[in-house]
């Protein structure tokens, strides 16, 4: 059963590779943006230890910072996957960084957290020279990247989690978080029949936490609801849509936040508002009106937090 599930997972992400290549080839990137591509944040030569920087062309001086963690089920994608999305954010007047990180099964989720932190430490050292204002930082991610956004934010605020994940805290705080269609509950994906869903989740947990996952020291310290309690998290924006096949994950996150002390807002698309507002639509199809609206509202939320107007 486990081998069959692994083949299903791999086939799914192989299909995404082809679909995303077609999607990106069909799109015209946003204009008026300077891009620095493939900058190494580790000196080991690993192709996934690289990042991209984006800034609006012709604009000098420090700009508020957006850090984007791409999705892809923890086992697919790189810094180029969300390139057009990051360019759109930069075109609106922001300094944007998006990194590659090693994928499972090469590493567990701990290795991914380590890579994200390493890229952020690089930004702490080099961001100012590229015009990144690190007193105003929005951390955002979509799908699995949304999960990593919540996890990285928690690790940054918890010495115990820093020890577990073997990272050093950053010298700057996150001003706000934006979790887009986040798959933040890794213990139950809620996609198929209960039997198949349990099998899929079990195999993913082996990949993410190490086999056997039930004996992993990461168990109980990886989902948002594991790590968030008791931490002084910054304001959180949740982006959710009913046509999203992972909508149950967004519903669970929204319910959790509604019963928590964490300040948060929601951008929600109903099926009636847009039937094509599917999983991570605003990232994959940056030029749709729904996407522009969502991304502009995300940046408005960030601006509101930075002005101190969020309540």
Model-derived features: positions:
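Alpha/beta-hydrolase superfamily serine-hydrolase fold, recognizing
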Residues: 1-311
């Amino acid at each position: 059963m486990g081998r069959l599930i692994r083949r299903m997972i791999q086939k799914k992400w192989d299909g995404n590779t082809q679909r995303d290549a077609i999607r990106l080839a069909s799109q015209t990137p946003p204009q008026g943006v300077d891009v620095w591509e493939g900058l190494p944040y580790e000196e080991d030569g690993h192709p996934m230890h690289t990042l991209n920087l984006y800034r609006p062309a012709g604009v000098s001086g420090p700009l508020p910072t957006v850090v984007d963690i791409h999705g892809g089920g923890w086992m697919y994608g790189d810094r180029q996957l969300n390139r057009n999305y990051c360019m759109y954010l930069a075109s609106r007047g922001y300094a944007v960084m998006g990194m590659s990180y090693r994928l499972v099964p090469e590493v567990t989720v701990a290795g991914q957290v380590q890579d994200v932190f390493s890229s952020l430490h690089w930004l702490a050292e080099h961001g100012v020279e590229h015009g990144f204002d690190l007193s105003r930082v929005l951390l955002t991610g979509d799908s699995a990247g949304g999960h990593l956004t919540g996890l990285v934010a928690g690790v940054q605020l918890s010495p115990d989690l820093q020890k577990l994940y073997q990272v050093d805290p950053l010298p700057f705080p996150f001003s706000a978080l934006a979790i887009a269609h986040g798959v933040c509950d890794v213990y139950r994906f809620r996609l198929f029949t209960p039997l198949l869903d349990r099998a899929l989740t079990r195999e993913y947990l082996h990949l993410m936490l190490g086999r056997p996952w039930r004996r992993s020291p990461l168990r109980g310290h990886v989902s948002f609801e594991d790590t968030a309690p008791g931490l002084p998290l910054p304001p959180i924006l949740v982006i959710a849509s009913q046509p999203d096949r992972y909508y149950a994950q967004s519903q669970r996150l929204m319910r959790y936040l509604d019963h928590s002390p964490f300040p948060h807002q929601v951008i929600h698309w109903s099926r009636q508002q847009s039937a094509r507002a599917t999983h991570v639509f605003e990232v994959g199809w940056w030029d749709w009106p729904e996407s522009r609206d969502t991304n502009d509202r995300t940046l408005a939320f960030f601006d509101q937090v930075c002005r101190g107007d969020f309540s």
